[in-house]
């Protein structure tokens, strides 16, 4: 106010702020080239990025799950102006935008601690409702490390936003709906001690303990995660080889090509990527060869898949075909998509 008074009196002129020019910012410090080995996991993350699919990584401590997850934004398409406006509104309500950053210029990457409350995850609070981690991840990535360590009620708050792309926070004073279309990336150990299936045989957990640990993630929640990928320990031979791995830039080029295919396919439908495909669009948008159809039919019966799991496999297969530049989903595309449902397979053991 004092500055305004001096300006009106002519004692001190307020200089205009330079206009904000929107451009995307991409941190250069995190690159997939830094990660030795784990080619199968990188492939799964590339598929997830290409179709905006949710992914769960399962592996022992030190296998690189967190390292890989933190590099996922480096292969995602640039944030568009429209997406930035949507996400910036959420951050503005949360009071997380500063004077020198009136808009987000990079995709959000949120990684809440496993002690976060249901309110912290979904939003709410006393008085004015505030967006939670779910909405702060809109148009970006929500990374949940050590997934079974999160409280069950916190994990379950994700179920509806994963389906609807929005979350409604209801309080006595009223309700508020925030957007929440994000990529969910989860990481977990295979058991409580972390070493089930490890070549060293270090696991000390009983079969019942392992089952109880995995039951912390409900079946309906697992159904909503498109890809389940095992992350093995990296052997010494790969660690000592300091030859740079494939860069994020190269992977991002393939992701962008696949996203461009999806953009043209879904133009005017309100759908932007394969993960958002609606049930009524599946038949026309996911044509299968006869061999692929028979494979999917056999997998449905053999794995005891739910209808939701079947649809998610089909969406992942659609993305794999897009990465290959092919219109029809082949047997190879379907087989690769099926192998990313490892927890469905293990449920039969």
Q: Locations of the language-model features?
A:
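Proline-centered turn/helix-capping motifs that create local helix->coil transitions or kinks
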Residues: 6-18, 80-81, 93-99, 193-196, ...
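Walker A/P-loop
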Residues: 57-99, 164
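Conserved inter-motif catalytic segment of the P-loop NTP-binding fold
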Residues: 83-117, 124-128, 232, 272-281, ...
């Amino acid at each position: 106010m004092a500055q305004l008074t001096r300006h009106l009196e002519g004692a001190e002129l307020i200089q205009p702020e330079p206009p904000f020019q929107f451009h995307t910012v991409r941190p250069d410090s995190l690159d997939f080239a830094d990660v030795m080995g784990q080619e199968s996991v990188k492939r799964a993350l590339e598929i997830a990025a290409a179709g905006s699919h949710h992914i769960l990584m399962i592996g022992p401590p030190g296998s690189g799950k967190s390292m890989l997850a933190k590099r996922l934004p480096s292969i995602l398409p640039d944030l568009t102006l429209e997406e930035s406006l949507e996400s910036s509104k959420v951050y503005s309500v949360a009071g997380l935008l500063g004077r020198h950053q009136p808009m987000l210029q990079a995709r959000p990457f949120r990684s809440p601690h496993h002690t976060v409350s249901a309110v912290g995850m979904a939003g709410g609070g006393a008085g004015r409702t505030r967006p939670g981690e779910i909405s702060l991840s809109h148009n970006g990535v929500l990374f949940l490390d050590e997934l079974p360590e999160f409280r069950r009620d916190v994990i379950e708050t994700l179920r509806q936003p994963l389906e609807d792309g929005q979350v409604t926070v209801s309080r006595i004073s009223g309700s508020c709906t925030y957007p929440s279309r994000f990529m969910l990336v989860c990481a977990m150990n295979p058991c409580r001690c972390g070493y089930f299936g490890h070549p060293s045989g270090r696991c000390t957990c009983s079969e019942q303990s392992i089952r109880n640990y995995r039951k912390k993630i409900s079946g309906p929640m697992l159904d909503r995660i498109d890809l389940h990928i095992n992350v093995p320990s990296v052997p010494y031979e790969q660690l000592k080889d300091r030859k740079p791995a494939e860069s994020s830039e190269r992977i991002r080029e393939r992701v962008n090509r696949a996203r461009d295919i999806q953009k043209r396919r879904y133009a005017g439908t309100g759908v932007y990527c394969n993960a958002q495909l609606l049930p009524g669009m599946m038949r026309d948008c996911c044509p299968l060869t006869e061999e692929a159809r028979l494979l999917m039919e056999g997998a449905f019966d053999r794995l005891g898949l739910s209808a939701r799991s079947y649809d998610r496999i089909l969406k992942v297969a659609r993305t794999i075909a897009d990465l290959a530049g092919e219109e029809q989903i082949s047997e190879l595309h379907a087989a690769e998509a099926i192998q990313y449902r490892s927890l469905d397979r293990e449920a039969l053991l």
